[in-house]
Amino acid sequence: MARPFPIQRTSIVREAGKKWFVVDASGKVLGRLASQIAKYLMGKNEPTFFPGVDNGNYVVVINADKVLLTGKKLDKKMYYHYSGYPGGLKQLTARQLLEKHPERLIYLAVKRMLPKAALGTKYLKRLKVYASDSHPHEAQKPQPLEF
């Protein structure tokens, strides 16, 4: 007896080899840079992109201390963290964070653009941010990215 409907087959997207990219953040606007980095971390630039499969790449960001913020965001934008104790809410302006920990500014911007689930944590582990123009990932031969 013949089947009235053909059997549907589902193809599974396999994880491909991860590529390494290096991005120079000097003179780039923070939000525009972070959205492009998030796209590469998730693998949305690949033709084999599938939302439930981790096909993302590694991204190394250099010169994080030379990133730009438009308008008055350097003085008006606040970053908060809480220690868990009463009176333990700490706040820094973007200027203070850029002076103390410039790599954390880009890290937080990209983190907030990634999914808030388990895959987002995997993506974030592949982000490497450095304040200077040198990084320890030369052995991976990262390809330069221009945005």
Swiss-Prot record:
Keyword Ribosomal protein: yes
Keyword Ribonucleoprotein part of the UniProt annotation: yes
Classification via Gene3D superfamilies: Ribosomal protein L13
Pfam family, one: Ribosomal_L13
Key words, A-Z: Ribonucleoprotein, Ribosomal protein
GO cellular component, one term: cytosolic large ribosomal subunit
Gene Ontology molecular function terms on file: mRNA binding; structural constituent of ribosome
Superkingdom classification of source: Bacteria
Example GO biological process: translation
Family: Belongs to the universal ribosomal protein uL13 family.
PANTHER family named in the record: LARGE RIBOSOMAL SUBUNIT PROTEIN UL13M (PTHR11545:SF2), RIBOSOMAL PROTEIN L13 (PTHR11545)
UniProt subunit comment: Part of the 50S ribosomal subunit.
Function noted in UniProt: This protein is one of the early assembly proteins of the 50S ribosomal subunit, although it is not seen to bind rRNA by itself. It is important during the early stages of 50S assembly.
Name this protein carries in UniProt: Large ribosomal subunit protein uL13
Native organism: Pseudothermotoga lettingae (strain ATCC BAA-301 / DSM 14385 / NBRC 107922 / TMO)
